[in-house]
Amino acid sequence: MSAKTILYVEDNEMNRQIVRDLLKRTKYQLVEAHDGEAGVAKALEIRPDLILMDIQLPKISGMEAMRQLRAQGPTAATPIIAITSFALSGDDQKAKEAGATAYLSKPYSPFDLLKLIRQYLPES
């Protein structure tokens, strides 16, 4: 059985490194994209098992990227965890309306992120 693939769409290198370090001790394969446009293209290319989507992204926002992914057959049902550092009241609902399966506010503990990933994508 091949490793399950997670696409992480995040423009901040430090945040990407934190997730890289977290997932290198798991059975998941991590693929990265650095902006919303690249994230949509990469998701359609590789068809990941789960997507971690930052909301504040260059080119197109994470919200718009999620809308585009939900409109595409190959990614319409892929779990998407929206991650944001600008958590305001109602943002979680807006993210879910845009296509997020779950929502996580920064700063978050790596344990909380891994727990959420495993909820939608068990390692076994």
Tell where the protein language model's regions lie, with residue ranges.
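Conserved acidic carboxylate
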Residues: 10
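Charged docking surfaces used in two-component/phosphorelay signaling
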Residues: 17-25
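C-terminal output helix
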Residues: 108-117
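Short hydrophobic/Thr-rich beta-strand motif most characteristic of the beta2 strand and flanking loop
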Residues: 27-34, 42, 104
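The feature encodes the CheY-like receiver
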Residues: 58, 88, 107
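Short amphipathic alpha-helix used as the core "switch/output" element in two-component signaling
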Residues: 41, 63-76
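Acidic catalytic/metal-coordinating carboxylates
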Residues: 14, 35-38, 61-67
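Active-site residues of response regulator receiver
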Residues: 54, 84
